Amino acid sequence: STERLDWTGRGVVIGLSAVHQDTAALTAVMIAATGWLQSLLAAPESDHVPRRVQVLEEIWALLGSERVAKYYQSCQKLARSYGVANISVAHRIADLRAQSDDGTSAAKVSMGILADTQTQILFRQSSDQVSEATEMLGLSTYQAQLLPQLVRGRALWRVGDRTAVVQHRIGSAEWAICDTDQRLNLDR
């Protein structure tokens, strides 16, 4: 695309809800979108813009395509030079495993991305997810025991080799984008 971004604007959202059930369509849209985003991030004029944040929710769905997985891998590796902080969201660690068990190049890239992640924020996981999280993330016995006990809003932060339990506080302005249960609440 020749569409330019206003880097001083509020942000860009690429909504995938219309194609998220169609694997072929999702892959096609993501290949086009990631190519466009990468060219914008690497453009010389992007050197003079404020730092940016790239958030990819339901990262497991995006890592099924080798092209998209490699885009995201390059974004992580070039984050400092692009001035971008990358945030990947997966609601269950098992969702990432589903993308990494088939032995494909995309699966290997996906596991590499996980291994390269320097900051991991883990909210409560059900007991049946803990062994998988422990294996994939290299959790200690203590960290694994904490995961199913975390209360809402509390997370296990792993930054490098340091660990802390952190209470997250969400302001009223942030709640609208953080409340993933809002569609279920009929009172709103």
Predicted region positions:
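C-terminal alpha-helical "lid" subdomain
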Residues: 174-178
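Conserved ATP-driven motor cores of ASCE-family P-loop NTPases powering translocation/secretion/packaging/pilus
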Residues: 66, 73-171
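Acidic, low-complexity intrinsically disordered tails
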Residues: 185-188
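P-loop NTPase motor domains
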Residues: 1-84, 146, 155-161
